UniProtKB/Swiss-Prot annotation:
PROSITE patterns: GRPE. Belongs to the GrpE family. The lineage of its organism: Eukaryota, Fungi, Dikarya, Ascomycota, Taphrinomycotina. Pfam families: GrpE. Essential component of the PAM complex, a complex required for the translocation of transit peptide-containing proteins from the inner membrane into the mitochondrial matrix in an ATP-dependent manner. Seems to control the nucleotide-dependent binding of ssc1 to substrate proteins. GO terms for biological process: [2Fe-2S] cluster assembly; protein folding; protein import into mitochondrial matrix. Component of the PAM complex, at least composed of mtHsp70, mge1, tim44, pam16, pam17 and pam18. This is GrpE protein homolog, mitochondrial. PANTHER family: GRPE PROTEIN, GRPE PROTEIN HOMOLOG, MITOCHONDRIAL.
Length: 223
């Protein structure tokens, strides 16, 4: 019985694990191989980073070129707009001048046609003696006619004056061949030589330009 217990005791006794000895050379070989396997991954990361930088540089260069092209295009458009505005202003000014010249020409033709009517009204008024104009009781019809003609002439000259027509006689002024036409010259006592002392027909200027000179008598100087 005692012998059976020993056999059973030795049968259930746990076995002791024995660690195999580590070979240093094998460990170094495994470490080197692992390092060799890890190195290509690092190189791939570096290569990927290099590729990303190059792509960014390429995109930046492309964007810069596009920006410069757009900037140039905008500058050209601005220049075209400025030129178009300048051309428009020049055209507008030219059209304005042409319209003014056309208007002035039309007014000049109209006023020249009306000068005879103005002269006739003036002559009609000048032939009525002053004493009869001032005596309404005896010459009522004549005075009424005179006042009607005077009002007609005044209104006509005001209307023509709106378009730049000016009437002048030149009496007392120095003779100017640009605005006066001398019809005779005589010595006049107390008058300055070469001055206008008489007007046969008045002159007219339209917007500063003579359309008919005044026909005048001029004081003659001593020879």
């Amino acid at each position: 019985m005692l012998g059976l217990g020993r056999v059973f005791s030795s049968a259930v006794r746990p076995r002791t694990l024995i660690r195999a000895p580590i070979n240093k050379r094998s460990f170094l070989w495994y470490s080197t191989e692992a390092a060799k396997e890890e190195k290509p991954a690092e190189e791939k990361v570096a290569e990927t980073e290099n590729v990303d930088v190059k792509e960014l540089q390429s995109k930046l260069s492309e964007l810069k070129s596009k920006y410069e092209a757009k900037d140039k295009e905008v500058a050209e458009l601005k220049g075209s707009i400025r030129q178009s505005l300048a051309d428009y202003r020049n055209l507008e000014n030219r059209m304005k001048r042409d319209m003014e010249q056309t208007r002035a020409f039309a007014v000049q033709k109209l006023t020249k046609d009306l000068l005879d009517s103005v002269d006739n009204l003036e002559r009609a008024l000048s032939i009525v003696p002053e004493e009869k104009r001032n005596n309404r009781e005896s010459n009522k019809d004549l005075v009424d006619l005179y006042e009607g003609l005077a009002m007609t002439e005044s209104n006509l000259m005001k209307t023509l004056g709106k378009y730049g027509l000016v009437r002048y006689d030149g009496i007392g002024e120095d003779f100017d061949p640009n605005i006066h036409e001398a019809v005779f010259q005589i010595p006049v006592e107390g008058k300055k030589p070469n001055t206008v002392f008489h007007c046969e027909s008045k002159g007219f200027q339209l917007n500063g330009r003579v359309i008919r000179p005044a026909k005048v008598g001029v004081v003659k100087g001593d020879d």
